[in-house]
A protein has these predicted regions:
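A short, Lys/Arg-rich alpha-helix, primarily the initiator
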Residues: 1-12
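Alpha-helical residues within the helix-turn-helix
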Residues: 11, 22, 51
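Short alpha-helical DNA-recognition segment
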Residues: 15-33
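DNA major-groove recognition helix of helix-turn-helix/homeodomain DNA-binding modules
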Residues: 25, 44-59
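DNA major-groove recognition helix of helix-turn-helix
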Residues: 35, 53, 61-64
Length: 68
């Protein structure tokens, strides 16, 4: 599964994959695999991303278009 919102929100904030990888304490390659759906996002990663961007986990997972 590819999470289009994960990439879109990163790009909307003018961030690189390496920027988010540092926040998550993972490699850029690992973050790229999250974004492309190669590696499943853990609950911990989803919570960190949701808190960082101020959006709901459902938004990150493309389950809604509502950011909150």
């Amino acid at each position: 599964m590819v999470f289009k919102n994960l990439r879109a929100i990163r790009e909307d904030n003018d961030l690189r994959q390496s920027d988010i990888a540092k926040i998550l304490n993972v490699s850029q390659n690992t973050y790229s695999q999250y974004e492309n759906g190669v590696i499943a996002l853990t609950a911990e990663v989803l919570i960190k991303l949701s808190d960082y961007y101020g959006v709901s986990i459902d938004y990150l997972l493309d389950r809604t278009d509502n950011r909150k």
